[in-house]
Amino acid sequence: MPKPIKAPKAAAEHTLIALFEEEAAAVIAALKPAQAKFLTLKGFAGKAGSLIVLPEEGGCKAWLGLGARKTYTPMSFRALPSQLPKGRWALQYDAELDAHAIHVAWGLGAYSFTRYKSGSTPSEVKLDDTALDDATKTAVAREVRAHNLVRDLVNTPTNDMGPADIEAEA
């Protein structure tokens, strides 16, 4: 089993463990008996998109199935901002995975078109980024902002997109 990357626990309230089908049985066997039994009863086997969230003292612990290693895509993380309980999540994942791509996928999943909504708030489900270096954090933020700008422009009605409006967005 590949060596996992563990984010510092102090920065996050919750823990998300992402694993492949090939590793699921070994990871489940190493859990506390109650957790292992629950995951087994729920049929968790690391299938792509499968997610189990359990409350525990001081936060939650979640397991995300990434599917087979050969079919993995970082976009597996995209739906999580709308599926997980609010708070900051520390991610434990295979060290071979691209942290930049995972954080971009998470950021894309947190997108919401709020231009015409009053009182809208950003996603309250955050992925802890303390394990990323400053250059990676900057690159992730820039890429997510670019995607979100394009999505905002696509979602904006054409009658609100005169030349001055488009210039203001850019």
Region locations from a protein language model:
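Short amphipathic alpha-helical segment within the helicase RecA-like ATPase core
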Residues: 1-169
